[in-house]
Curated annotation (Swiss-Prot):
Biased composition (Basic and acidic residues): 506-525
Task of the protein: Acts as a chaperone.
PROSITE patterns registered for this protein in UniProt: HSP70_1, HSP70_2, HSP70_3
Name of the protein in question: Chaperone protein DnaK
Biased segments, Acidic residues type: 647-667
Encoding gene, per UniProt annotation: dnaK
Amino acid sequence: MGKVIGIDLGTTNSVVAVMEGDDPEVIENAEGSRTTPSVVAYKDDGERLVGAPAKRQAITNPENTVSSIKRFMGRFYDEVEDEIEEVPYEVVRGENDTARVQIGDRKYTPQEISAVVLQKLKQTAEDYLGQEVTDAVITVPAYFNDAQRKATQEAGEIAGLNVQRIINEPTAASLAYGLDDESDQVVAVYDLGGGTFDVSILELGDGVFEVNATYGDTHLGGDNFDKRLIDHIADEFEQDTGIDLRDDPMALQRLKEAAEEAKIELSSAKTTTINLPFITATDEGPQHLNMDLNRATFENLIEDLVEKTVPQMEKALDDAGHSKSDVDEVILVGGSTRVPLVQETVEDFFGKQANKSVNPDEVVSLGAAVQGGVLSGDVDDVLLLDVTPLNLGIETLGGVMTTLIEANTTIPTKESEVFSTAADNQTSVEVHVLQGDREMAKDNRTLGRFHLDGIPPAPRGTPQIEVTFDINADGILNVSAEDKDTGKEQSIRVEANSGLSDEEIEKMKEEAEQHAEEDERRKERADTINEANSMAYSVEQGLEEYGDKIPEDKRSTLQEALDALNEELETASADEDITALEDALEELNAAWSAAGEEIREAQQQQAQQGAAAGAGAGAAGAGAAAGAEGPAGGPTGGPASGNGAADSDEEDVQDADYEVVDEGDDE
């Protein structure tokens, strides 16, 4: 196995890291940033943007720019009604009642969108390592259910990655934090990202990272903070002007970006100003938004959201069997933990200062890289014992959920229980697999259903049906049912309710590869266009400076080649075939090379003539001084002509330097 990269696939930003020697390292992307916005945009001309370039154009293209897609991963349409209201793009009902994104006439699954981000991270790692990357560890929120985990695996597969392991974000953070610490300690990891919240209690010691308990909320994160700010600003503006900016997608996108910036600024400053000129227009003319916002107002807006995390911390401690005083370290993970109110709430709860030695944006990817190192054999003496976040069981008589594997059970694990029939002469049983913490089956999430047929007729309660739940290290479930009398067995690998068959995943994978190839071709074409522009400029400058040194026939050929290239440049596009431009560039290069030889010959002749004239002047004049001053009898500045020739030799070499203008490389 080669290098196994670690990926934090985040709601707002994503990060990729890899083990370098004994330490995990975050890899910078092509834009020079250590984090990549989890944003994908589709332009009218078919071009696809990802990361910072996609985020930059969101204001002018909000309906076709997808962000926060992680909130829709592995989710039914009816589960994400609140999230749908918060995004500018269209979310529709797809197959199997899943949520999908409508872009033009195409419905994209969240897995496909996430795969585009993963492709970007994969390419980032390959550029850094100088080799193909196929294996990865990807992190998910600890409270992700089975469907969300499977959807994340599918996204990796579509992106061309072999997902070696899915691990929980708080657990990954603890790996990065505690890799070099051999002391026994209890650690609380508080992870508040862009769209999800988790808190985990772990015991660390002697290379063993054991998760005792985890709780969370997959509907809570920095996006919710932004939404409160957006509504506050929009309400204030509507009160002043009577205009609701939330009805205008472009204005709403500007508002969203301003709210995000204000949130970040208020993490370090007491006040900030939101200034959005020309935010909208009325019959009276353009309207501008200018508003001062202080930290106290912001904290009042989000206080109840932050308080929602407190009961989760209490539950995690209780399930772990620890008290607050047992906790040795509190680690903050996720960009939203930079908000002072969040830090104060966590520190007040645990009664100690949080450990801020790790970068909250990067620590999860670093931990994923460590786990990748464990799997590849680059890291020794590390054992990760994670837990399943929710109860797992089946529906039994009366619509009750009977739990086989309880929440916060260490994985991998396997549990069996014997059930029987509910009616006389029942020859088939349905196994309805559930995940959740509610008592009744209807209140929990269905993971799958299957039937065990061929049970011999018998009075109810007589057949012995053994149901086995088996969870692997990724937290993904296999369920089997066996009739103990006949030995007949039926099993199911619980699949995500993504509506994706193996064939569909393979098709999406091929499309993703084609997109990657097209993106590379587009970049190559853009580079060629830039080179052609630079070449045309250099030749124009050369003709202006040295045109009199080029014979008429070659000067005419050069001018024709230059005109032909400029004509091609007028219509050249990185999105289309540019074979004609490449041919014109090659012809201009050849013509310029031939002209260059004529220029060099002319300059050499001039240099020789200058040197000869200078020598004649020295013989005819009255000494060296006379030669220098150039009196009657010798041309002025003979030696200077010689120096001029030397200068001309240097100037003859025209450096065709050009700046690569690639929107994808601009931060």
